[in-house]
A protein has these predicted regions:
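C-terminal binding/interaction regions
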Residues: 2-6, 10-11, 89-146
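Glycine-rich phosphate/diphosphate-binding loop of Rossmann-like nucleotide-binding domains
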Residues: 4-24
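Structural motif
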Residues: 6, 32, 64-65, 86, ...
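Short amphipathic alpha-helical segments
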Residues: 16-19, 74-77, 117
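A short beta-strand-loop structural module common to alpha/beta enzyme folds
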Residues: 28-39
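Helix-adjacent hinge/juxtasegments
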Residues: 45-85
């Protein structure tokens, strides 16, 4: 799977750990930065990753900041993106099964590396349920962009 990833300075260490893990699992990762701990603006990196997913250049995207809130808001401003802020494994599974999310956000100050790995693994391995009522709800949400 080709995965877009982006973060701000507050989540650099977790992003780098995720990149290494994802590549070791055989995923292709497109890293949109940031690459240093210098203070930066999270919307720049979240938008870059989200645009790659929306354009079909990447299959899914992961964005990170200290809480995950800012990057999830920014990613969801890009047409075609359904980004969920995740802090537990159940939500990771449910957001794929019910919402067919194409991006996820993590808060590096909220969860540790081990839990982040579990959340990402679950989110990447869970398929959309294909249940008609879930698709209907997704269609209604996506129609709000028009």
């Amino acid at each position: 799977m080709k995965i877009a990833i982006g973060c701000d300075h507050g989540a650099l260490d977790l992003k780098n750990a995720l990149v290494s893990r994802l590549e070791a699992q055989g995923h292709q990762v497109q890293d949109f930065g940031t690459y240093t701990k210098d203070s930066c603006d999270y919307p720049d990196y979240a938008a870059a990753a989200a645009k790659a997913v929306a354009a079909g250049e990447c299959d899914r995207g992961i964005v990170l900041c200290t809480t995950g809130i800012g990057v999830s808001i920014a990613a969801n401003k890009i047409r075609g993106i359904r980004c969920a802020l995740l802090s537990d494994v159940l939500s990771a599974r449910m957001t794929r099964e019910h919402n067919d999310t194409n991006m996820m956000a993590l808060g590096a100050g909220i969860i540790g590396e081990k839990l982040a790995f579990e959340i990402v693994d679950t989110w990447l391995s869970t398929a959309f349920s294909q249940v008609p009522r879930h698709q209907n709800r997704i269609d209604k949400v996506m129609a709000l962009e028009k």
